[in-house]
Amino acid sequence: MRKLMIALALTTTLAVVAAASAALPHPGARYTGPTNSKVVNGFGNTVTFLAGARTLKRFSFGTLGCFGYGTFPVGVDPYSTSLAQLTKSVPVTAKGTFAVTSTPANWSGGDSDTKLKVSVVGSFSSATAAKGTISVTETGANGSCGPVKMTFIAKLGGQ
């Protein structure tokens, strides 16, 4: 009987630990953080998204594209004038991983002929932090380029 109780306690403990190790975001919360993109004029790049129960919504980040973005006037944040936002939500698994492949993004940079396809892969290391990689491919009148990759660490409520 004693061995049965020990085995039951051990099994229950392992099940609780396994369930607790799956880090999921807080639904309705905003996550924001820096990317490893090059700092331009003192301005860094940021990623931001809203967490749903099993999706990341309004996933956005700055990108200068891969064809080049022109000049960067002093005092102007080039990433804020060149935001990309995914047109669909990014699914989150029960284990806290997330991924979307080659999805279109609305982009405020470039010209109207330039289109972005974005892939995002990452995971939540806790309910308050996620890290991942964003890959951007650009297609326009001059052909296509990419992928340009950047990594990010986003935290609950901000940087």
Each PLM stretch: what is its role?
Residues 7-15:
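Bacterial N-terminal signal peptides
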Residues 17-24:
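Sec/Tat signal peptide C-region and signal peptidase I cleavage site
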Residues 1-4:
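Positively charged n-region of N-terminal signal peptides that target proteins for export
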Residues 24-32:
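A glycine-anchored, Pro-Gly-centered beta-turn/N-cap motif
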Residues 31-129, 133-143, 147, 152-159:
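Predominantly extracellular/secreted and cell-surface proteins with exposed
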